[in-house]
Structures are given as structure tokens and as C-alpha cells.
Curated annotation (Swiss-Prot):
HAMAP family (alphabetical): Arg_succ_synth_type1 (MF_00005)
InterPro entries membership: Arginosuc_syn_C (IPR048268), Arginosuc_syn_N (IPR048267), Arginosuc_synth (IPR001518), Arginosuc_synth_CS (IPR018223), Arginosuc_synth_type_1_subfam (IPR023434), AS_cat/multimer_dom_body (IPR024074), Rossmann-like_a/b/a_fold (IPR014729)
Protein name according to UniProt: Argininosuccinate synthase
Annotated source species: Geobacillus thermodenitrificans (strain NG80-2)
Reaction catalysis annotation: L-citrulline + L-aspartate + ATP = 2-(N(omega)-L-arginino)succinate + AMP + diphosphate + H(+)
Assigned keywords, A-Z: Amino-acid biosynthesis, Arginine biosynthesis, ATP-binding, Cytoplasm, Ligase, Nucleotide-binding
GO molecular function terms attached to this record: argininosuccinate synthase activity; ATP binding
GO cellular-component term (any): cytoplasm
CDD domains reported for this sequence: ASS (cd01999)
Pathways per UniProt: Amino-acid biosynthesis; L-arginine biosynthesis; L-arginine from L-ornithine and carbamoyl phosphate: step 2/3
Length: 406
């Protein structure tokens, strides 16, 4: 009788390489799945490594465009920053990874999927909730959470089974990267008082090493979608990668954040998101120009909720779908060009224009070209302030009655 098949989210690192053997020992034929999310890793090597370790099949799927257009774009249009800081680098990729795991499992007739998450992180929740939303019949196995080995025990197991030990195993940092940015934790970063060492960064220059001359760029949007960079059309994934290089050179997008994890603990994380933070800044400025006041004031409430929903692993949920429906409605007129200066860690918006601009210079100016009806302000103020006036009159009358004993 053939062994049951299982699809493993495979990174090529020690944990998921050991997981292949560990799952085989429990009777599974393991199919490895690795996605190209724009992290720049040699994925051909990863594919071959999975097969050498013992996987019966190894998938490597380029999902950069899908990730950019269907995941990162929603976060961008929501100006999504979890707790006002974190642009959801890892949180955005997990539902897409889960989706591909399920698709391959269904294609291959697998009975289960597996991931390499520990028992104290957010990703285990994001993966497992997403998988159950997409196919509740699949079993989900978390080998690292189950085996509870020390690092030394895991290395010993790897040596015993001929599993290659990664050359970067001595690095104190735990890193996750995709085209939307790079996250870094562990090592000295676990001390919230300790300054992150420069070796913790890869995508961004320090302020000391950033150029002394700024770059000024222009980003074009159509209905909330970035479409041009300096007048040249780009697919979104490529534009993000271009901005990672340009803005990263100037030290834009470094984030040092103590965040509240879904599992109830606080965690100190260091992020590098030069492209994401530049795009969010430009997009928000274009919205300021094109959204009516009521929408502009209400949308941040939705943005905060979308960020929480994504962070908390509820991508495949009715709530997220409803929030995104509102979000899409707000983007119809978010078309135009934003000029941004990149310099010494800052993305500074210097100009914005749009055919849907609600800024009317003839109404805003204080020159002789002013067309604002100043006399209309008298009636407006009277009506606007009427509830406050009535409240004051009533309070004074009652205060007078109390003081006279009436």
C-alpha cells in the first residue's frame, strides 16, 4: 500500500530539511513546495536540496506577480501598517503560501500539509487558519512545534541522516524576506534596549553611508495602483523591487518595532521595507488630494482593521472580503502622479497632481484670484455652532435655577 502524500512548505533551511526526514519516518511521502516571493534566493538550489534530502517531488513556483497584485496591493491601498509601523511583510505572504500548499495537495492527492513554524509565533496561526478556510479536510502538521528539540539536538539529527547543515546556521538572526520587505528577529534584537547592529540590515543603507545627494522620483497611479516610475511603466512586482533598490540606497524604510503578537507576547522586530514605505507614503498623499473629506476621515478606521485582520491570519475571511470591498470603492479616483525626494532615511513628498484633484486653487488662494464666498461663512458658522450655543444657554439657565433654589 502506498504511503499517504503530504505537501511541506519548504524553505531550504535546517528546520524544513529536517522535517522532510521526520515526516518520512512517520510514513509520509513528502512533496516540497517553495515559492519565489521576490526574496532573491537561489531557488533552483532549494529545489534540488529538497530532492536530495528525500522529497519525492519538489515544486518551485514564481508567485511574485500574484503576490504583488493580489496581496501587497491590498495592503498598499489600505496604507496598512500594523500598530502604525509594520507593513505586514511576512503576514501578507502566509495566505498565498497556504493557498499554494492546498492547490498542490489537491493536485497530488495529498492528505495533509505541513509547515515549519514554532509554537510561539504568529505564522502557525496564519498558515493553519488559512489552510482550514481553503480545505478543511486536509490535516495540518507542524513538525517543529511537535518535536520540541533544542538546536543542538536538531543538528545532531541532521548529521545522523546526512542532511546538509546551512552555512549561515551560526547567524544569530531569524530572517524572512519577500519583495514587500525583510523581517529580522532573534539574537541581540531580543533585547529591546540594544541598538540593532549594522549587520542586521541588508536592503537599506545606514544614514551615515547614505548618499549626500537625494534622488527625486515620480510615481504614477491609476485607481490606486502604481503603474509608472519616473514615467516608465512597470509591472507592480518589478516596481516594488526597483524602489527597494532606489529607496534602500537612501536608508528609507528601516523600522524598529516592539509589536503585540497574536499569541499574546510582545516581540522586538527589525524590518526593512524601502519600496513598501515609499509607495504607502506616495499613495496616502494622492488620497489626500482626491478623496472627499468624509471618506478621508473614515478610511483610516478601515485601514487599521484591515491591518489587524491580515496580521491575525484572517485573509480568507468574510470580514476581510467586506473590508476590501469598501477599500476598492475608495480607489476609483486615486489617479495621478506623486513626486518624492529620497534622502537620508526619509521619503519626502514634494508634489502631487491628479485629474481628480479636489484641491481648487481659486478657492484656496488668498490672492486677488480668490473665488471663495467669504460672506457665506456667517450663516455656516451660525448653523454649525447652533447646538453648542443652545447647550450653553440651557446649562446657564439650569445653573441659575440651582443657585437661586428654584
Amino acid at each position: 500500500m502506498a504511503n499517504p502524500k503530504l505537501v511541506l512548505a519548504y524553505s531550504g533551511g535546517l528546520d524544513t530539511s529536517v522535517a522532510i526526514k521526520w515526516l518520512q519516518e512517520r510514513g509520509y511521502d513528502v512533496i516540497a513546495c517553495c515559492l519565489d516571493l521576490g526574496e532573491g534566493k537561489d531557488l533552483d538550489f532549494v529545489k534540488e536540496k529538497a530532492l536530495k534530502v528525500g522529497a519525492i517531488k519538489s515544486y518551485v513556483i514564481d508567485v511574485k506577480d500574484e503576490f504583488a497584485n493580489e496581496y501587497a496591493l491590498i495592503a498598499l491601498q489600505a496604507n496598512a501598517l500594523y500598530e502604525g509601523k509594520y507593513p505586514l511583510v511576512s503576514a501578507l505572504s502566509r495566505p498565498l503560501i497556504a493557498k499554494k500548499l492546498v492547490e498542490i495537495a489537491e493536485l497530488e492527492g495529498a492528505v495533509a500539509v505541513a509547515h515549519g513554524c514554532t509554537g510561539k509565533g504568529n505564522d502557525q496561526v496564519r498558515f493553519e487558519v488559512s489552510i482550514k478556510a481553503l480545505n478543511p479536510d486536509l490535516d495540518v502538521i507542524a513538525p517543529v512545534r511537535e518535536w520540541s528539540w533544542s538546536r543542538e539536538e536538531e543538528i545532531e539529527y541532521a548529521k545522523k541522516h546526512g542532511i546538509p547543515i546551512p552555512v549561515d546556521l551560526d547567524s544569530p538572526f531569524s530572517i524572512d524576506q519577500n519583495l514587500w520587505g525583510r523581517s529580522n528577529e532573534c539574537g541581540i534584537l531580543e533585547d529591546p534596549w540594544a541598538a540593532p547592529p549594522e549587520e542586521a540590515y541588508e536592503l537599506t543603507a545606514s544614514l551615515e553611508n547614505a548618499p549626500d545627494v537625494p534622488d527625486v522620483i515620480e510615481i504614477g497611479f491609476e485607481q490606486g495602483v502604481p503603474v509608472t516610475l519616473n514615467g516608465k511603466a512597470y509591472p507592480l512586482a518589478q516596481m516594488i523591487l526597483e524602489l527597494n533598490a532606489i529607496a534602500g540606497k537612501h536608508g528609507v524604510g528601516r523600522i524598529d518595532h516592539v509589536e503585540n503578537r497574536l499569541v499574546g507576547i510582545k516581540s522586538r522586530e527589525v524590518y526593512e521595507c524601502p519600496g513598501a514605505m515609499t509607495l504607502i507614503k506616495a499613495h496616502k498623499e494622492l488620497e489626500d488630494l482626491t478623496l472627499v473629506r468624509e471618506v478621508a476621515h473614515f478610511k483610516p478606521l478601515i485601514e487599521q482593521k484591515i491591518a489587524e485582520v491580515i496580521y491575525n491570519g484572517l485573509w480568507f475571511s468574510p470580514l476581510k472580503d467586506a473590508l476590501v470591498a469598501f477599500l476598492k470603492e475608495t480607489q476609483k479616483n486615486v489617479t495621478g502622479v506623486v513626486r518624492v525626494k529620497l534622502f537620508k532615511g526619509h521619503a519626502i513628498v514634494e508634489g502631487r497632481k491628479s485629474p481628480f484633484s479636489l484641491y481648487d486653487e481659486k478657492l484656496a488662494t488668498y490672492t486677488s484670484e480668490d473665488e471663495f464666498d467669504h460672506q457665506a461663512a456667517v450663516g455656516f458658522i451660525s448653523l454649525y455652532g447652533l447646538p453648542t450655543k443652545v447647550n450653553s444657554i440651557v446649562n446657564k439657565q439650569n445653573k441659575s435655577s440651582v443657585s437661586t433654589g428654584q
